[in-house]
A protein has these predicted regions:
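Conserved glycine-rich cofactor-binding loop
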Residues: 10, 17-18
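Conserved glycine-rich Rossmann-like NAD(P)H-binding loop of the short-chain dehydrogenase/reductase
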Residues: 31-47
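The beta1-alpha1 cofactor-binding region of Rossmann-like NAD(H)/NADP(H)-dependent oxidoreductases
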Residues: 61-71, 103
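Substrate-binding pocket helix/loop in short-chain dehydrogenase/reductase
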Residues: 97-98, 102-107
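Active-site helix of classical SDR
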Residues: 121, 156
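Residue(s) in the substrate-gating loop at a strand-loop-helix junction
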Residues: 140
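SDR active-site lid
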Residues: 173-239
Length: 291
């Protein structure tokens, strides 16, 4: 598929204060795109916007808030004149056994990752139809394979993958393209936060190669940018993820067998696993909800 120049395009990135969102905003800006940053950390968003080489601005908003996101969409269009690209990247995570999980944190992962993505699309689709633009929904390896101790995250990412695939067919005749982005464990604040828990870190290290590695962020984001330039339906931040699609039907059975052994091994320590949202992004979400 031919590339679309990003020069002069207007891109909205949610979850843009750090990690994938922050670096993606920078790389889009370096290619000439004007960037609207959305998130829950005003100081960080302002700093990111100030470092970008192209025209950029930021908005404080909770992606689960319909009215707030609709207002952001109106203001971004008023500020830049149009919107060509929306990247639904905002996300949080929590680990640990489902039975012992904090129900509030578990539900919040679903709300931010799945419902928040749908709220984002609902707010920006009208302007994307005007520009015949592109919506990239960030999913994960967790959409392809189950991961014990990460039930909320897997459920949310499986959900956004399914919803985005449905949406693609619904909006195609308007000229809007919809993509799904897949990332394995990538060196972000969220992954580093999860690794602070000894059990979660050791479980991850026992995954089969190449899923047991933490991958550098810049090459992953470069591949996401390339997917945006091509308006791709599937974007793989690590190339080997493409091959996982062909075997995903076998993975639940394999994971059930291997997972039983591994969870039994760690059973005496499972009660020690943190039940809160991980990383600075999780802390920002908790602070926002606390008022």
């Amino acid at each position: 598929m031919s590339k679309v120049s990003l020069q002069g395009q207007v891109a909205v990135v949610t979850g843009a204060a750090r990690g994938v969102g922050e670096l993606l905003a920078r790389k889009l800006s370096e290619r000439g795109a004007k960037v609207a940053l959305v998130g829950l950390e005003p100081d960080e968003l302002k700093a990111v916007a100030g470092r970008l080489p192209s025209d950029a601005d930021w908005w404080y908003a909770d992606v689960t808030d319909h009215e707030a996101l609709a207002q952001v969409a109106r203001e971004v269009k008023a500020r830049f004149g149009k919107i060509d690209i929306v990247v639904a990247n905002a996300g949080v995570a929590v680990g640990g056994p489902f039975e012992e999980s904090d129900p509030v944190a578990w539900r919040r992962v679903i709300e931010v990752n799945l419902v928040g993505s749908a709220v984002t699309a609902r707010a920006f689709l009208p302007v994307l139809k005007e520009s015949r633009g592109y919506l990239l929904q960030i999913a994960s390896l967790a959409a392809i394979t189950p991961a014990p101790m990460m039930s909320a995250y897997c459920a949310s990412k499986s959900g956004v993958e399914a919803y985005a695939n449905c949406l693609r067919a619904e909006v195609a005749y308007h000229g809007v393209k919809v993509g799904v982005g897949y990332l394995s464990w990538t060196d972000t604040d969220m992954v580093r936060g999860a690794d602070q828990d000894d059990v979660m870190r050791e479980l991850r290290q026992r995954l089969p190669w190449p899923a047991n590695k933490t991958y550098p962020l810049p090459p992953a984001v470069d591949r996401i940018v390339a997917g945006i330039e091509r308006r791709s339906a599937k974007v793989y931040a690590q190339p080997w993820l493409r091959g996982m699609q062909s075997i995903r039907g076998y993975l639940p059975g394999i994971i059930a067998t291997v997972g039983k052994r591994e969870i039994k091994r760690f059973a005496p320590r499972l009660s020690q696993v943190s039940t809160g949202l991980v990383g600075s992004g999780g802390a920002a979400d908790e602070k926002h909800r606390a008022g």
